[in-house]
Regions:
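Iron-sulfur cluster-binding cysteine motifs and their immediate structural context
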Residues: 33-40, 59-77, 87-103
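Auxiliary Fe-S-binding modules of radical SAM enzymes
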Residues: 2-17, 215, 226-304
Length: 304
């Protein structure tokens, strides 16, 4: 069995406890306008362009048959959706400025990468985190990878939107030690507007997890996106929903990530902000926490 993997990040300290290896799987059913990993949204393998590697030799344009690569305003642009001989273009690029955004990997191939970090997992309950994209979109591969990790005694975690059938989640639960579940927007209207899908399935899955013995595995997360998720109404709305199920749930408020903007240049897409916002200050993060407290939650984690 193989899966579509767009990155494996070693020595990660932001995707769970301790030192972790984070495996990023391609494909996501959500289309969040602020997506932190836009290269992982499409399930298809697509070309990406690294401008900092480019020597502007224009070999890619010469090898392009269907204008998949063009020059506009003295800048190289790629058009990933065009039917193009991408493998030839990539092979001819002398600096690796154009590359594919992912590769097919077997469970064993991924495990070979994971084992390189295994000796570090003993410090601080480290292990493997499967992220994306949305790993539940490739749930069969995710399940086999989790099983392989557990066979080797490796702590496992998943970062997920929970936008999947409940039966899929049940398939993975026996092999998960930690579940980081995104709850981005409280209202159906806002969720449809900013992510393109309803939040009802997500809310139902959160309820299922928090009403069973699995609730201690769960940390609910909300990324703070200016003018979208980082509002009093939204944070209080999420907190009230969670409080109505399990008031002691762990709820993490994630700071805005300004580094995501650079990834949009790789795939030749516009970012949702004309001017990239800055990180929220500690004072602002504490205010977000206070709004969650007003909504009835007690166990709140702030990412500064």
């Amino acid at each position: 069995m193989t899966g579509k993997v767009f990155d494996i990040r070693r020595f990660s300290t932001h995707d769970g406890d301790g030192i972790r290896t984070t495996v990023f799987l391609k494909g996501c059913p959500l289309k969040c306008v602020w997506c932190q990993n836009p290269e992982g949204i499409s399930i298809r393998k697509r070309p990406i362009y690294f401008e900092n590697r480019c020597m502007h030799c224009k070999t890619c344009i010469a090898k392009s048959k269907n204008q998949g690569v063009t020059m506009e305003n003295d800048k190289i642009h790629i058009h990933p959706n065009r039917n193009e001989n991408w493998n030839t273009i990539i092979d001819w690029c002398p600096t690796g400025a154009i590359a594919m955004d992912s590769r097919e990997m077997s469970v064993e191939m991924v495990m070979e990468e994971i084992r390189k970090d295994k000796s570090f997992y003993r410090y601080g309950n480290g292990g493997v985190t499967i992220s994306g994209g949305e790993p539940l979109l490739q749930w069969k591969f995710t399940k086999e990878l989790l099983k392989a990790c557990k066979k080797e005694g490796i702590h496992t975690a998943i970062e997920t939107s929970l936008y999947a059938d409940q039966e899929v989640i049940k398939e993975l639960l026996p092999y998960l030690d930690r579940i980081f579940a995104d709850f981005k927007l409280a209202t159906e209207k806002d969720h449809m507007h900013y992510t393109g899908v309803s939040n009802q399935k997500i809310k139902d899955n959160i309820r299922y997890l928090l009403e069973t013995s699995n609730r201690e595995k769960v940390i609910i997360r909300t990324p703070m996106i200016p003018e979208m998720t980082a509002t009093k109404d939204n944070i209080k709305g999420i907190a009230k929903y969670l409080n109505g199920i399990y008031q002691y749930v762990s709820y993490e408020i994630l700071n805005y990530n300004p580094l995501a903007e650079a990834k949009y240049h790789l795939i030749d897409r516009e970012y949702c902000f004309e001017e990239n916002p800055k990180l929220y200050t500690k004072e602002q993060m504490r205010e977000f926490k206070n709004w969650a407290v007003e909504g009835g939650l007690e166990n709140i984690i702030i990412e500064s």
